[in-house]
């Protein structure tokens, strides 16, 4: 029984890691209100093959060295990766740099595609 409790606690803490997870619809709403700064964490080639409108590409491996490019700290910073598994780690990096309003696209770009939402 203690192992089950540990697993549950791990899953709960991991689900909140890096920032609050949001739906595609919430991302669209925040973006339409001009209240979001979208960061696509995928590699440049994947970004060029299709990304969410108004997102900028800062690959995860470069994020720690490029936080100075995040100029609009008054907006929600929404992190986007392939499946939503890299974004929590990126959120932790941003929180250590002093960013407070970090959000994560639940399911990443794959979930976005599954909902037939547009990419540019």
Predicted regions mapped to residue ranges:
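Short, surface-exposed ligand- or partner-binding patches at beta-edge/loop junctions that are enriched
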Residues: 80
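Rhodanese-like catalytic fold shared by cysteine-dependent sulfurtransferases
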Residues: 1-24, 33-36, 44-76, 85-120
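Conserved histidine-centered catalytic loops in small-molecule metabolism enzymes
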Residues: 27
């Amino acid at each position: 029984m203690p192992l089950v409790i540990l697993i549950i606690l791990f899953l709960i803490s991991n689900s909140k890691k890096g920032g609050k997870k949001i739906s595609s619809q919430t991302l669209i709403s925040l973006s339409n209100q001009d209240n979001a700064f979208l960061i696509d964490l995928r590699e440049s080639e994947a970004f060029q093959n299709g990304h969410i409108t108004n997102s900028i590409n800062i690959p995860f491996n470069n994020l720690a060295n490029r936080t100075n490019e995040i100029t609009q700290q008054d907006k929600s910073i929404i992190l986007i990766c392939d499946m939503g598994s890299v974004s929590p780690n990126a959120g932790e990096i941003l929180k250590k740099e002093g960013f407070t309003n970090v959000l994560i696209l639940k399911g990443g770009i794959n979930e976005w595609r599954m909902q037939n939402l547009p990419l540019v």
